[in-house]
Swiss-Prot record:
Ranges spanned by the short sequence motif TXY, renumbered to the chain: 171-173
Gene: HOG1
Active-site residue list: D141
Protein's UniProt name: Mitogen-activated protein kinase HOG1
Molecular function per GO: ATP binding; MAP kinase activity; metal ion binding; protein serine kinase activity; protein serine/threonine kinase activity
Cofactors required: Mg(2+)
Localization of this protein: Cytoplasm; Nucleus
GO biological process terms held by the UniProt record: cellular response to oxidative stress; osmosensory signaling pathway; stress-activated MAPK cascade
Amino acid sequence: MAEFVRAQIFGTTFEITSRYTDLQPVGMGAFGLVCSAKDQLTSQAVAIKKIMKPFSTPVLSKRTYRELKLLKHLRHENIISLSDIFISPLEDIYFVTELLGTDLHRLLTSRPLEKQFIQYFLYQILRGLKYVHSAGVVHRDLKPSNILVNENCDLKICDFGLARIQDPQMTGYVSTRYYRAPEIMLTWQKYDVEVDVWSAGCIFAEMLEGKPLFPGKDHVNQFSIITELLGTPPDDVIHTICSENTLRFVQSLPKRERQPLANKFKNAEPAAVDLLENMLVFDPKKRVRAEQALAHPYLAPYHDPTDEPVAEEKFDWSFNDADLPVDTWKIMMYSEILDYHNVDAAAQEGENGGS
């Protein structure tokens, strides 16, 4: 039985196994508190995320279960990886992942990025998205603060709690407004992996300019800012809007022409502008895919088709439509955690030659 120790962080009880020491608060999210710590077993710095009251409601239980399943399934250099998970005696859940020193939001607010860093960061974002999308997963909430970076400029995408299945009927909006694809914002009926490419395009533009590309005050203002630059959406795209109110709003706007992005990004090289043009397209069907974007000339210094892996198997979303009571989610969660530790123990035994 693991020994647990308690610490008070921001008035919150952190109850962790004695394997972890030197707890320091890193950040507070909507669903949990994150601390850095030292892993006594590996001597590595780690991030420990406490999921607050994961079993308080069926919705929270399902969200936590989804994040756990995704973290277990997604294994890629540009995706944050799970190194431990446990349930404390108080029945809080703790995810332990690798610790990266900063995130893209902090980098962007501290100084302008040089060209080679912009290229390398965008390459890694798209490399991660290619893998995630091949697993049948859409992140849906890609933004600079969800993109972690270490001192070697290695980049990892995190926070898959809002991720959803690739589903033609996906609806609702979840991502931070500035980076939200128009098909989510306008509640068009269908959206898919292309929403992440739009978000990546907004992040790319922010790296080039040093400030958000579409800083809308609300949804109406956001859409207006987008059309000022990209013009009015084509009619065939407008007709995919399901909400009558949204459709009337879009049709009431003055017609605008798309502006050449080269006029706005005067300091960017033509190849960068060309890739951005292909990422920020109203029609999701005409928006470049992550795999195609990786092969764009702008990313030629890093592109290596033999080192841009896809997922070995699709993620199993069969649980996602389930409407289950908290106790059932809890049993499923315990089962997943036991499975994680059994698989982990077997892998370590294999590495040690079965000794």
